[in-house]
């Protein structure tokens, strides 16, 4: 499991680097996104991955790797938005955004390590296409919960 932690930290470093570069270029413009908009952005990325997996070809010169990076970053943005609520304008500094990014990346690592212990790294035997399908399924679930205004019966 030590390798898993290092691999996670490496992937998060790659994702954070892109997040930081986009913060430099655009600032925290994503602060205006409502939770449903973040959900839709993740859906768009996951749907593109599935389309590429199914068709086997892309017309835009970006592969699935960049889409998975975007899913990670939008996922963290979503967690930040759920904590703070959306804003009418970018209302934080780039540095504040990175502190929050790091907070949720750390929380995600801790959760992954706990689940990894319980599931004994079964995910390593999964196909990439299964990840895509699971992400899409969870997005559809999230959209349904959003449609119900968060009121679920279980």
What is the predicted function of each stretch?
Residues 1-154:
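Intrinsically disordered, low-complexity regulatory regions
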């Amino acid at each position: 499991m030590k390798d898993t932690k290092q691999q996670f930290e490496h992937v998060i470093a790659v994702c954070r680097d892109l997040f930081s570069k986009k913060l430099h270029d655009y600032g925290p413009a994503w602060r205006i996104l409502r939770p449903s908009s973040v959900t839709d952005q993740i859906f768009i990325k996951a749907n593109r991955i599935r389309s590429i997996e199914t068709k086997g070809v892309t017309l835009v010169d970006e592969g699935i790797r960049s889409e998975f990076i975007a899913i990670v970053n939008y996922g963290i943005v979503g967690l930040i938005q759920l904590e703070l609520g959306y804003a009418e304008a970018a209302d934080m500094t780039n540095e504040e955004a990175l502190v929050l990014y790091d907070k949720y990346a750390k929380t995600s690592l801790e959760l992954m390590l706990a689940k990894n212990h319980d599931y004994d790294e079964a995910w390593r035997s999964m196909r990439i296409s299964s990840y895509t399908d699971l992400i899409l399924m969870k997005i559809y679930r999230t959209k349904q919960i959003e449609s119900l205004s968060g009121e679920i019966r279980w």
